[in-house]
Amino acid sequence: MASQGTKRSYEQMETDGERQNATEIRASVGRMIGGIGRFYIQMCTELKLNDYEGRLIQNSLTIERMVLSAFDERRNKYLEEHPSAGKDPKKTGGPIYKRVDGKWVRELVLYDKEEIRRIWRQANNGDDATAGLTHIMIWHSNLNDTTYQRTRALVRTGMDPRMCSLMQGSTLPRRSGAAGAAVKGVGTMVLELIRMIKRGINDRNFWRGENGRKTRIAYERMCNILKGKFQTAAQKAMMDQVRESRNPGNAEIEDLTFLARSALILRGSVAHKSCLPACVYGPAVASGYDFEKEGYSLVGVDPFKLLQTSQVYSLIRPNENPAHKSQLVWMACNSAAFEDLRVSSFIRGTRVLPRGKLSTRGVQIASNENMDAIVSSTLELRSRYWAIRTRSGGNTNQQRASAGQISTQPTFSVQRNLPFDKTTIMAAFTGNTEGRTSDMRAEIIRMMESARPEEVSFQGRGVFELSDERATNPIVPSFDMSNEGSYFFGDNAEEYDN
């Protein structure tokens, strides 16, 4: 069912395409990007933003959220049926920041959702352009992955908070389609499934009746998506068992938690896409660049080239470090929240620090924050090299995972070892052999035990000079093998709260 994901490239998922050749894919992804850019230009005109204000990432986020909210059919229907005081279900808006007399001021804007939908469709040749909406969702998800640690969500479902490298895409809305499913980490899928099973345990009617039938179909579909991410037969077999369970309960939760842990070493295949804020696409379109004609790919050199020439600004709070804010956004743009810091640093050409060492909070500014002391600065989003994004998880002959975060989920297809603290990971498996699946469990544990942290993944793969667009001369970096690099290592990042 969902394993079609493996048959179609991300770009096809991203553009709802049937099988297309590379040129058609590049054109349809380009069309999607161009549509986002045209929409953004039009919104900047509507809001009377000058060029600098239009390149402010906080304004971009507000405009992006407005269009996502305008197209959120289920929520819109819900809001109309359950009117809440002071909220107009037909309107959407948010904070827009402008320079007034040398100071940044916050202005709350409100628009008819219908009007936003009209502007979006007009920018996308009359289409709803769902692919473009999903692209924006994935950019927001990548930014969340880089900014917040999902410890609380993990602990609530009985998982280890150190498993955060499995949590890519954990804030993606359910409606994000195949492209969204492709970028979700193993932990994210496990979390969604456990939440579902817990509801079934607490609510007798959850699996019953007409609604229950739909619930069951959704459950099996999510199981298949997760199964498609695993790369070993034993993990896939355990997923079949979870999916076929007559009445999913605690045994399934145990199996899923076991599988999530196993993914720290036997990593799943999780797609990585470079999704940029709308304020990058807008100015590019405005300068006359034709994305559809030139073609575009989310996993190749194109996003790197675009970021090399883009000017993006950000508001900075009084005690924040602009360089650290830049790193946060750079990681989000490159979908590198769970990549090894050694690799990210090499590609970026400047040292990438773990989250706990960054003096910066999230990009968005809360409505109750005082604007008086807030300044703006240029985000440094350029890179020294570029590398191909991977979907493989980087397992050598079926295994691999690093410490603190206790694992990584590689973003770039670049040769390195993927160090992991085996004792920490294996400790989680001792003595837990009850459950019906001990043969599969034994097989999975055996594969994990034979994994060696020093083995090299992505053999022979390297980074490329930005001028080397055809990827002809790979530069294979050499890393200090002993030094592992996890972003959330020993961390104090804020929690993500919806």
Swiss-Prot record:
Residues 8-21 have a biased composition (Basic and acidic residues). Keywords: Capsid protein, Helical capsid protein, Host nucleus, Host-virus interaction, Ribonucleoprotein, RNA-binding, Viral nucleoprotein, Viral penetration into host nucleus, Virion, Virus entry into host cell. Late in virus-infected cells, may be cleaved from a 56-kDa protein to a 53-kDa protein by a cellular caspase. This cleavage might be a marker for the onset of apoptosis in infected cells or have a specific function in virus host interaction. The keyword RNA-binding applies. Residues 1-21 are annotated as: Disordered. The keyword Transmembrane helix does not apply. One of its GO terms (molecular function) is structural molecule activity. It is found in: Virion; Host nucleus. A motif (Bipartite nuclear localization signal) lies at residues 198-216. GO terms for cellular component: helical viral capsid; host cell; host cell nucleus; ribonucleoprotein complex; viral nucleocapsid. InterPro entries: Flu_NP. A motif (Unconventional nuclear localization signal) lies at residues 1-18. One of its GO terms (biological process) is symbiont entry into host cell. Encapsidates the negative strand viral RNA, protecting it from nucleases. The encapsidated genomic RNA is termed the ribonucleoprotein (RNP) and serves as template for transcription and replication. The RNP needs to be localized in the host nucleus to start an infectious cycle, but is too large to diffuse through the nuclear pore complex. NP comprises at least 2 nuclear localization signals that are responsible for the active RNP import into the nucleus through cellular importin alpha/beta pathway. Belongs to the influenza viruses nucleoprotein family. Homomultimerizes to form the nucleocapsid. May bind host exportin-1/XPO1. Binds to viral genomic RNA. Protein-RNA contacts are mediated by a combination of electrostatic interactions between positively charged residues and the phosphate backbone and planar interactions between aromatic side chains and bases. This is Nucleoprotein. It comes from Influenza A virus (strain A/New Zealand:South Canterbury/35/2000 H1N1).
